[in-house]
């Protein structure tokens, strides 16, 4: 038996028709929607080509929660040129509109534009110590009513360039 439905999407892909469908499904089985916010820092939003304003996330998350659907927000820690404070601001912002949060380390993968900037020394990947430090501070500001669904992830080892330590997430956990 299906116990619940979890949908991961972009906030700009949730139009009124999708909302109606999700609301209908939520009456049959619980529905969770994971929204990819990644960051709220505008220069980072442009850099990663997210493609929508923070207000689109807020609008979609609010509409989903208003119809009884739990929202889980995805945040990437370690984006180029983001300070620890920038990352914590994104976490804090996401928690205002979420029932859950997924925290993900930035992975630099082969065949990406990000790799070129990394190889050109435009930014450094986080060390494990930096990531754990940021993660601990992030966890400390997440309200008790917001479920932490992920503390880290592991990139595909065949294409992972950096940080290589992230290939073994058990070490991080």
Give the location of each predicted region:
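Structural motif
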Residues: 28, 67, 96-97, 141
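Hydrophobic faces of well-ordered beta-strands that scaffold small-molecule active sites
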Residues: 5-7, 31-35, 71-75, 101-103, ...
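Auxiliary Fe-S-binding modules of radical SAM enzymes
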Residues: 97, 107-173
């Amino acid at each position: 038996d299906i116990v619940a439905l979890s949908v991961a999407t972009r906030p700009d892909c949730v139009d009124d028709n999708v909302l109606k469908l999700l609301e209908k499904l939520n009456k049959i089985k619980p529905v969770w929607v994971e929204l990819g916010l990644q960051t709220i820092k505008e220069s980072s939003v442009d850099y990663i080509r997210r493609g929508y304003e923070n207000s689109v996330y807020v609008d979609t998350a609010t509409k989903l929660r208003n119809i009884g659907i739990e929202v889980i927000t995805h945040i990437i820690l370690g984006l180029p040129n983001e300070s620890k404070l920038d990352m914590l601001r994104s976490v804090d912002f996401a928690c205002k509109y979420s029932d859950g949060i997924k925290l993900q380390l930035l992975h630099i993968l082969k065949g990406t534009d990000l790799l070129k900037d990394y190889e050109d020394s435009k930014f450094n990947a986080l060390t494990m110590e930096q990531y754990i430090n940021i993660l601990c501070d992030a966890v400390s500001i997440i309200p008790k009513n917001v479920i932490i669904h992920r503390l880290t992830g592991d990139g595909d080892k065949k294409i992972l360039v950096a940080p290589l330590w992230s290939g073994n997430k058990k070490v991080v956990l």
